[in-house]
Amino acid sequence: MTETAKRPLYVPHAGPSLLEMPLLNKGSAFSTQERIDFNLQGLLPHNIETIEEQTERAYSQYNLCNTDLDRHIFLRSIQDNNETLFFRLLEEHLEEMMPIIYTPTVGQACQEFSKIYRTHRGLFISYPDRERIDDILRSATKNNVKIVVVTDSERILGLGDQGIGGMGIPIGKLSLYTACGGISPAYTLPVVLDVGTNNPDLLNDPMYMGWRHERVSGAQYEEFVDLFIQAIKRRWPNVLLQFEDFAQTNAMPLLERYKDELCCFNDDIQGTAAVAVGTLLAACKAKGEKLSEQTVTFVGAGSAGCGIAEQIIAAMQLEGLDEAQARRRIFMVDRWGLLTDDMSNLLDFQHRLAQKRADLGAWGGQQGDDLALLEVIRNARPTVLIGVSGQRGLFSEEVIRELHSHCKQPLVMPLSNPTSRVEATPQEILNWTDGQALVATGSPFQPVQVGDKRIPIAQCNNAYIFPGIGLGVIAARANRVTEGMLMAAANALANCSPIVTQGEGAVLPALGDIREVSKRIAVAVAKQAQAEGKALHTSDEVLNDAIEANFWFPRYRAYRRTSF
């Protein structure tokens, strides 16, 4: 327990208003003296409980819920009433509840957002209010915000445009910053930019709570986002801003525009890439191979897939390959087939990842013919197969068996969310490779039984990366998030892998260990920030103390009454 946690907290609120503040409310855990001092007598049942007793009751209530969506709604109601209790409950049941507060259940919660809405959380910034964004930010009840997660809801998981329902993603993401990375909920703020929706189901839904208008795009959209960014810089100049679930047409351009202007990153592009590279590095270490020796095929060439590919290329270069050599080991397949330089419909960020058609002469086919996934597997002979397509079943039995025919222990990563959109299930992949493949998925899966072996499945979850990045940035007071910091995070994650440290188990650590993993990642990220001049240099002791001081644990502090 830190010295801060031992000290009493001076609180100017009292009576019913105190009970309505989720950051301060202790419910039945207010002591007798606190009930007297804060005018709470008669507002709570007589018995005074510990947080352990409250958590036990909450968990028993949780178990009465019939569906995952009901469980999500229940947990969110606790969060909106008592954040300390919510995070203690989450802390004690993290592996069980992470799929409920975030993927895959959060996808359904986003779809049903207007129907299950209970109370306010975060900021809704609508296009019609664009001239009042500074006023809106001043309305935030939290003054010392250190992390903002913002979405425009156009690409929510694999579900597409969800309008303001996308608010469920920043809320869930920030819950994981706290649960996994120890960042106080008092420092976090979820934001949705309501620029309308092109989802006809929402536009025609009488219960939809967002701006009922087609999406703003082009120059109007860019101007609106810039108004928001500039207002954020004025309100919280040192904040870490995370872009979340923007469509690929906007995600990369926004990141490129603002990455050198404020401390920001895009988790879909950079966080996904970092955890994927960390997984690859762990698999390579376990097999006694180098990342630079691998050949990687992607299915899905959007901003997330291309972001992963670029970070793999950077990691290969760190192992001695030049850029051209590294790029020749990456094969990107989308709906049109393998990306090649003779395609006329390539997006800006895809050009550098397209293979030269002239180099593929031995593959057969005429100029302009599509090269489908199976043909790429046969000719490129990859050792790693990564799916970010959002299309169920693309990793067919024929594809996986062809992959396995030339690689004894391939790494297969069907990363698409939610579970219904995964390219292949771990059971299928392991059945088709005689249990020899290494598997990491984007959604949670139970261990798989193959013969007499029970094989744990690593969830290649961004929650292994972004909480540690956030903690490291806050502790070091870094002013930017760089590619070097992301690579440091990936290496730190790989070094925590059970298959590396113990020689067996899953490719990634158990979720039960994620808070300690986040601390290790935070140290690596902070040291890299210092090495690059993005944070003031300190001794290791001072840095470790800063990380511990910023690592919040859900426990109640004693309260003392004060005035404003």
From Swiss-Prot:
InterPro entries: Aminoacid_DH-like_N_sf (IPR046346), Malic_enzyme_CS (IPR015884), Malic_N_dom (IPR012301), Malic_N_dom_sf (IPR037062), Malic_NAD-bd (IPR012302), Malic_OxRdtase (IPR001891), NAD(P)-bd_dom_sf (IPR036291), NAD_malic_enz_proteobac (IPR023667). The record marks 268 as: Important for activity. Divalent metal cations. Prefers magnesium or manganese. Pfam families: malic (PF00390), Malic_M (PF03949). NAD(+) binds at residues 155, 268, 417. It is an enzyme of class 1 (oxidoreductase). GO terms for cellular component: cytosol. Its cofactor is Mg(2+); Mn(2+). Gene3D superfamilies: Malic enzyme, N-terminal domain, NAD(P)-binding Rossmann-like Domain. A divalent metal cation binds at residues 244-245, 268. Keywords: Metal-binding, NAD, Oxidoreductase. The keyword Metal-binding applies. Its EC number is 1.1.1.38. GO terms for biological process: malate metabolic process; pyruvate metabolic process. The active site is at residues 102, 173. GO terms for molecular function: malate dehydrogenase (decarboxylating) (NAD+) activity; malic enzyme activity; metal ion binding; NAD binding; oxaloacetate decarboxylase activity. Belongs to the malic enzymes family. Homotetramer. This is NAD-dependent malic enzyme. The gene is maeA.
